[in-house]
C-alpha cells in the first residue's frame, strides 16, 4: 500500500470519528463503544409486568476471593486483594429476570459475610452498619450474549441477549466502594433514559 493511499484512508477514518490525530504523538483509535452522558436514568422497566407478582432475591453464593483484574481496577485495589462477591438472582414469582453480582473490598465491610441478603437489604445494612454515605456512581451499559452459567441462572438459552450494566458507587470521600454487575434479560427489561436536547 502506498503512503498516499494509507494517508487518504487515515483521513477518511478521522472524518468518520474512528481515529484521532494528535500532533507530535500520532494517530489513535477511538473506542467504538459510545461514552454518552445521559441527564438522568429514569428507570429499568420490566416489560409485560404482571400485577401482584411477588419479587424476591435468591442467593446463589457469597464468598471471599481474590479480586479479578477488572474488579480490582474498578475498586482501585491491588490484584492480590481479598474481595467479597455476592451473587443473587431476582425473581418475579418463579421467573428469574436479572442476575446481580456485588463486589466489595473484604477489609472494608467484613461483616457482610455474616448476613443473608436474600432476605435483608444490602444497601440498608451498609448504611446502618458502616454509615456509608454514597456520593455518586459511574455506570456503563453494554449489550452482551448469555454464557452457560448466566443462561442456567436466568432460564434462557445460551447466546440470548442480555442488558449488562456495571455500576461503581463512590462514597463521600470519592473512594469507589462497591462494584455491581447486573445482567438483565433483554426479553423482560428495557432501559429508559431522559436526555437534555
Where are these regions (language model features)?
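Residues at secondary-structure transition points
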Residues: 4, 36-39, 117
Amino acid at each position: 500500500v502506498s503512503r498516499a493511499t494509507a494517508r487518504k484512508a487515515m483521513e477518511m477514518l478521522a472524518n468518520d470519528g474512528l481515529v484521532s490525530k494528535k500532533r507530535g504523538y500520532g494517530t489513535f483509535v477511538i473506542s467504538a463503544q459510545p461514552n454518552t452522558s445521559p441527564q438522568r436514568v429514569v428507570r429499568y422497566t420490566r416489560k409485560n409486568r404482571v400485577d401482584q407478582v411477588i419479587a424476591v432475591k435468591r442467593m446463589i453464593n457469597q464468598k471471599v476471593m481474590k479480586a479479578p483484574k477488572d474488579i480490582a481496577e474498578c475498586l482501585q485495589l491491588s490484584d492480590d486483594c481479598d474481595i467479597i462477591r455476592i451473587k443473587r438472582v431476582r425473581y418475579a414469582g418463579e421467573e428469574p429476570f436479572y442476575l446481580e453480582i456485588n463486589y466489595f473490598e473484604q477489609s472494608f465491610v467484613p461483616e457482610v459475610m455474616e448476613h443473608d441478603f436474600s432476605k435483608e437489604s444490602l444497601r440498608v445494612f451498609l448504611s446502618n452498619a458502616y454509615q456509608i454515605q454514597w456520593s455518586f456512581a459511574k455506570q456503563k451499559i453494554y449489550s452482551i450474549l448469555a454464557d452457560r452459567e448466566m443462561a442456567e441462572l436466568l432460564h434462557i438459552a445460551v447466546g440470548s441477549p442480555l442488558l449488562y450494566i456495571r455500576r461503581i458507587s463512590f462514597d463521600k470521600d470519592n473512594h469507589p466502594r462497591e462494584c455491581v454487575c447486573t445482567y438483565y434479560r433483554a426479553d423482560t427489561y428495557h432501559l429508559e433514559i431522559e436526555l437534555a436536547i
